[in-house]
Amino acid sequence: MGQKYLFIDRDGTLIAEPPEDFQVDRLDKLALEPDVIPSLLALQKAGYTLVMITNQDGLGTDSFPQETFDPPHNLMMQILTSQGIHFEHVLICPHLPADNCTCRKPKTELVTAYLNGGLMDVANSYVIGDRQTDIQLAQNMGITGLLYQRGGLNWQAITDQLTKRNRHAHVNRVTRETAIDVNVWLDQEGGSKINTGVGFFDHMLDQIATHGGFRMNIEVKGDLYIDDHHTVEDTGLALGEALNNALGDKRGIGRFGFILPMDECLARCALDISGRPHLEYKAEFNYQRVGDLSTEMVEHFFRSLSYSMACTLHLKTKGRNDHHRVESLFKVFGRTLRQAIRVEGDTLPSSKGVL
């Protein structure tokens, strides 16, 4: 996955644009836009890399000498740097519109390096600016544009929009045996809709969502006229993939997470969203089925899920009642998952720098 970038305009976006001549060519013309410093700090903390991109009409000519541009620009950069704000690059087009150059926004020559080689996370990178040319630049780059307005979509609103978690994933898995559609919303709770055709399995999947503190919709059409094997197995694969995708870059998650008593049962679960699939499972049942679910498929479900979710999962339960033993495994997994997916900060919980 590429890096999240913010390509930010300067005049009218980071700093106020003088209405009389649209040039910040004196120190007394320099004024930061409201809330720009705390907003940029919050956006950096959320994992965005900042790039400044600006058109400076006629820079270096008699109409806009370099020596009048540099003092306010350098002071602006010093202020931002002193507050912990870092721009990876400052990209400037010095040409006039009449020059018909190839680098003036909304043309993309200045950002060519970001458009090649998968460097940029296209789905989570943005252009922020106060003019339609900034929005057109975003369109030309294939990313989203945010039109800055001090009285509307201002820095506080932009920061709220870009840092508010909305971790969602959709997986559609179709084979000769099953057709499965899964939607997962990790930052929403309640209202899950689950229909696998296996009633007790639906109830168990709902336990994961309820105790995991998230919402999911699962719709399955499987070859139940044979048995429940493919339905349960493929649901585990699709759900694990959806959970893994919804976690995204995993920045700030707890990663690890529990022990759960349920009546006479004691269920244990240890989870590491490690990127390494592995299952250790210990549970014994008296009967082949609980309701319409084969008890042997419980282990198979968690093995499939741990494989596609790329997590290390240890599950164990003891008890006397098969219904309680099965349910305790799904509940304890949900509670453990709640801990592991909870956002606790902004750093990646790995000394390797990758999960």
Swiss-Prot record:
Mg(2+) binds at D9, D11, D130. One of its GO terms (molecular function) is imidazoleglycerol-phosphate dehydratase activity. Its cofactor is Mg(2+); Zn(2+). GO terms for biological process: L-histidine biosynthetic process. Zn(2+) binds at C93, H95, C101, C103. It comes from the Bacteria. Pathway: Amino-acid biosynthesis; L-histidine biosynthesis; L-histidine from 5-phospho-alpha-D-ribose 1-diphosphate: step 6/9; Amino-acid biosynthesis; L-histidine biosynthesis; L-histidine from 5-phospho-alpha-D-ribose 1-diphosphate: step 8/9. The active site is at D9 (nucleophile), D11 (proton donor). Its EC number is 3.1.3.15, 4.2.1.19. Keywords: Amino-acid biosynthesis, Cytoplasm, Histidine biosynthesis, Hydrolase, Lyase, Magnesium, Metal-binding, Multifunctional enzyme, Zinc. Residues 1-166 are annotated as: Histidinol-phosphatase. It is found in: Cytoplasm. Its main location: cytoplasm. It catalyses: D-erythro-1-(imidazol-4-yl)glycerol 3-phosphate = 3-(imidazol-4-yl)-2-oxopropyl phosphate + H2O; L-histidinol phosphate + H2O = L-histidinol + phosphate. The keyword Plastid does not apply. GO terms for cellular component: cytoplasm. Residues 167-355 are annotated as: Imidazoleglycerol-phosphate dehydratase. In the N-terminal section; belongs to the histidinol-phosphatase family. In the C-terminal section; belongs to the imidazoleglycerol-phosphate dehydratase family. HAMAP family: Bifunc_HisB, HisB. This is Histidine biosynthesis bifunctional protein HisB. It comes from Pectobacterium atrosepticum (strain SCRI 1043 / ATCC BAA-672). The gene is hisB.
